[in-house]
């Protein structure tokens, strides 16, 4: 849209981390481009790229963080809440251990927002991420809540976020364990109503398993009897 020259290197078209070290790749790309966006699994990869590229490196998604998605989500919440960010409450429900749960917790803590997570304790962010969030909240005045009760997590909230329960690359067998843990954390009409806020809005970074119109959605329905997974 802005007229930049963009080159896309897909996994099959690059030897990064395989036949060529991250360091060497960073140095070469840094001489060819004005900026690099990395979207992949390892947080350590994007950090090493940033150390050696000599140009700005953007995290487009890793296993730990999804900052570009969070910037878009913040803009959306600002546009649709009618409140300053510091007065806006939002809740993440589901598996909170990975990039979306981590990023939503930390950005809310940084910006002084009312930030909640509703998840089984086994699926909370790591102790290190939680400690970082509390440290940021002490400076910003953010209100943080981590609870295993999804009803408590959404009470009075302005936005309810969720994400898929099984990430790319995880084996199919994981579905059984995740669904057993997370059945009570699906975003349903009842959970939206539990917010007690007629203006509450739903957010998802997508793609979402919300019906039977995909192969996975149909398999989930036949196997577990669920029409939709994390949201219905």
UniProtKB/Swiss-Prot annotation:
Q: Where does L-ornithine bind?
A: 99, 163, 167-168
SUPFAM superfamilies, alphabetized: Aspartate/ornithine carbamoyltransferase
Where in the chain is the site Important for structural integrity?
Answer: 79
> What does the record say mutating residue 14 to T does?
In strain: CCUG 4165A
Write down a Pfam family by its short name.
Answer: OTCace_N
Does the keyword Amino-acid biosynthesis belong to this entry? yes
- The coiled-coil regions, if any, are none
> Could you name the domain of life of the organism this protein comes from?
Bacteria
Q: Which UniProt keywords apply?
A: Amino-acid biosynthesis, Arginine biosynthesis, Cytoplasm, Transferase
The protein's matches in Gene3D superfamilies, at most eight in alphabetical order, are given as: Aspartate/ornithine carbamoyltransferase (3.40.50.1370)
- Effect recorded for residue 187 to F: In strain: NHITCC 2376
Q: Name one GO cellular component term.
A: cytoplasm
Q: Which GO terms describe its biological process?
A: arginine biosynthetic process via ornithine; citrulline biosynthetic process; L-arginine biosynthetic process
Which reactions is this enzyme annotated as catalysing?
carbamoyl phosphate + L-ornithine = L-citrulline + phosphate + H(+)
Tell me the route in metabolism or biology where this protein functions. Answer: Amino-acid biosynthesis; L-arginine biosynthesis; L-arginine from L-ornithine and carbamoyl phosphate: step 1/3
Task of the protein: Reversibly catalyzes the transfer of the carbamoyl group from carbamoyl phosphate (CP) to the N(epsilon) atom of ornithine (ORN) to produce L-citrulline.
| Family, as annotated | Belongs to the aspartate/ornithine carbamoyltransferase superfamily. OTCase family.
How is this protein named in the record?
Ornithine carbamoyltransferase
Gene encoding the protein: argF
